[in-house]
C-alpha cells in the first residue's frame, strides 16, 4: 500500500508508549484511526493530541483478555472509522519472572492477550479486506519471539507464536491483495520492560541497547508501504545471530551468555519481584509484579 492517506486503521494497544508513537506515525500519513485500549483517559488524551494535528481519530474501548470484547472489536472500529484497510496488532503484556512462579491463570491471560486476541481480531478483519481488494495486517512481536529470553518465557513464547502466525498467514495470502507483516523490536526506549528496568535502577548490558520508539513506528509504515514479511528493529544487526542460532545453537547460546543477557534478565526478574505491589491486577497473585500493559 503506497498511499495511506484516507486509509482506515485499527490500532490496538494505542495508549501504551509504543502505541502512541505508531498512532502519531500513521496519523502523519493521513490515516483515519480507531484507537483501541482498555482505559479511556490515556486514549482520550492521545485522540485530542492527534485531532489538534488535524488527524481523524476515534476511540474503541476493549479488554483483549475478554473473548467477547475481542470478537466485537472489528465491528466497533468500522462503525467509528469505516471499513478497515489496516490492522495494527500492538497490544500486549509482559512480566519478568521465573517461569515456575507463574500460575496457570497468569499464563492463560498472557496467551489470550498476546497471541489469541491478535489472531481473532485479524480473522474478523480479513474477510472485509479481501472483499474490498485492499488491506494490510501488521503485528508487533519482539526479538524475544525470535531468539528466546530467560525469565520472560511466557512472553517470548507468545511473541514467537505471533511470528509463526504472521508467516503462515502471509503464505496463505500469497497473490492476494492483502499483506501481512510482523515487526520484531528489541528493547524500546521509554516503554515496556525497558522503562520498568530504568525505574528499578537495573542497567542493561550494551548488547541490549534500546531503540527509540519512533524507529519502531517507522518500521510499521515501511512494512505497510513495501509489504515487508518481517522487520527486526534493534540497535545491533540481529540476523547474523539468528542465523547462527539455527545453524549452531550451542554456539549461539555461548554468544548470548557472553553478553550478560541471562544474568541481566535474572536480576530484572528479582528486582521486579521485590518491588511488586500488594495487589497487581489482572494477575491474581499478590507476590508478583503485574504485567506491563501496552494496551
Where are these regions (language model features)?
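The beta1-alpha1 cofactor-binding region of Rossmann-like NAD(H)/NADP(H)-dependent oxidoreductases
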Residues: 61-72, 104
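Conserved glycine-rich Rossmann-like NAD(P)H-binding loop of the short-chain dehydrogenase/reductase
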Residues: 31-45
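SDR active-site lid
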Residues: 171-236
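Conserved glycine-rich cofactor-binding loop
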Residues: 8, 13-16, 39
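Residue(s) in the substrate-gating loop at a strand-loop-helix junction
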Residues: 142
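Substrate-binding pocket helix/loop in short-chain dehydrogenase/reductase
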Residues: 98-108
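Active-site helix of classical SDR
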Residues: 122, 158
Amino acid at each position: 500500500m503506497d498511499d495511506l492517506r484516507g486509509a482506515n486503521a485499527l490500532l490496538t494497544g494505542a495508549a501504551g508508549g509504543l502505541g502512541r508513537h505508531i498512532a502519531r506515525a500513521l496519523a502523519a500519513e493521513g490515516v483515519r484511526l480507531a484507537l483501541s485500549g482498555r482505559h479511556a483517559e490515556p486514549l482520550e488524551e492521545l485522540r485530542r493530541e492527534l485531532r489538534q494535528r488535524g488527524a481523524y481519530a476515534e476511540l474503541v474501548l476493549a479488554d483483549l483478555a475478554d473473548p467477547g470484547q475481542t470478537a466485537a472489536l472489528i465491528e466497533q472500529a468500522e462503525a467509528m472509522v469505516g471499513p478497515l484497510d489496516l490492522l495494527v496488532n500492538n497490544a500486549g503484556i509482559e512480566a519478568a519472572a521465573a517461569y515456575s512462579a507463574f500460575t496457570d491463570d497468569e499464563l492463560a491471560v498472557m496467551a489470550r492477550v498476546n497471541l489469541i486476541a491478535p489472531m481473532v481480531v485479524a480473522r474478523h478483519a480479513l474477510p472485509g479486506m479481501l472483499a474490498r481488494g485492499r488491506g494490510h495486517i501488521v503485528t508487533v512481536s519482539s526479538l524475544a519471539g525470535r531468539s528466546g529470553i530467560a525469565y520472560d518465557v511466557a512472553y517470548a513464547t507468545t511473541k514467537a507464536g505471533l511470528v509463526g502466525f504472521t508467516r503462515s498467514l502471509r503464505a496463505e495470502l500469497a497473490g492476494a491483495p492483502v499483506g501481512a507483516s510482523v515487526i520484531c523490536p528489541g528493547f524500546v526506549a521509554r516503554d515496556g520492560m525497558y522503562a520498568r528496568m530504568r525505574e528499578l535502577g537495573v542497567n542493561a548490558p550494551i548488547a541490549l541497547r534500546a531503540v527509540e520508539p519512533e524507529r519502531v513506528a517507522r518500521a510499521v509504515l515501511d512494512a505497510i508501504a513495501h509489504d515487508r514479511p518481517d522487520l527486526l528493529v534493534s540497535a545491533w544487526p540481529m540476523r547474523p545471530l539468528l542465523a547462527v542460532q539455527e545453524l549452531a545453537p550451542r554456539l549461539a547460546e555461548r554468544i548470548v551468555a557472553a553478553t550478560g543477557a541471562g544474568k541481566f534478565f535474572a536480576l530484572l526478574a528479582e528486582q521486579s519481584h521485590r518491588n511488586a505491589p500488594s495487589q497487581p491486577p489482572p494477575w491474581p497473585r499478590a507476590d508478583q509484579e503485574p504485567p506491563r500493559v501496552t494496551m
